[in-house]
Swiss-Prot record:
It comes from the Archaea. The gene is orc3. Involved in regulation of DNA replication. SUPFAM superfamilies: Winged helix' DNA-binding domain. This is ORC1-type DNA replication protein 3. Disruption phenotype: Not essential for normal growth. Belongs to the CDC6/cdc18 family. Keywords: ATP-binding, DNA replication, Nucleotide-binding, Plasmid. It holds the Pfam family Cdc6_C. It comes from Halobacterium salinarum (strain ATCC 700922 / JCM 11081 / NRC-1). SMART domains: Cdc6_C (SM01074).
Length: 110
């Protein structure tokens, strides 16, 4: 699923699984929401968080590999924004990330 993905890319996906778990009524999350949670995850695993634009590039890379789906919206005065949704089962993605990434295991107390 995410073999060869750098820790920053896995941390972004983990942030999205955290958002999904904490907001079961939502399916789509804006880049800014994901980036905010990602910054916390990155610091928790003691890695320097990537900036917003680099995080956006990494999210789009996950779209091209089929892990994420994205959609663009225009909101008039609020401008354009992109939202992302995990493809497949969120818990399976979360478990796969945790099992394959020792740094993320520390967040789970493993």
């Amino acid at each position: 699923m995410v073999k060869g993905t750098p820790l920053s890319g896995k941390s972004l996906l983990f942030a999205l699984t955290r958002l999904d778990r904490n907001n079961p009524e939502k399916e789509w999350f804006r880049t800014s929401e994901i980036h905010e949670v990602y910054q916390t995850v990155a610091r928790d695993v003691e890695v320097e968080p990537k900036g917003y634009n680099r995080a956006l590039e990494l999210l789009n890379k996950h779209v091209t590999t089929g892990v994420l789906e994205s959609k663009k919206k225009e909101r008039g005065d609020q401008g354009k924004f992109r939202s992302y949704s995990l493809q497949g089962d969120v818990e399976s993605t979360r478990t796969g990330l945790i099992n394959s990434t020792p740094e993320l295991q520390t967040l789970m107390g493993w």
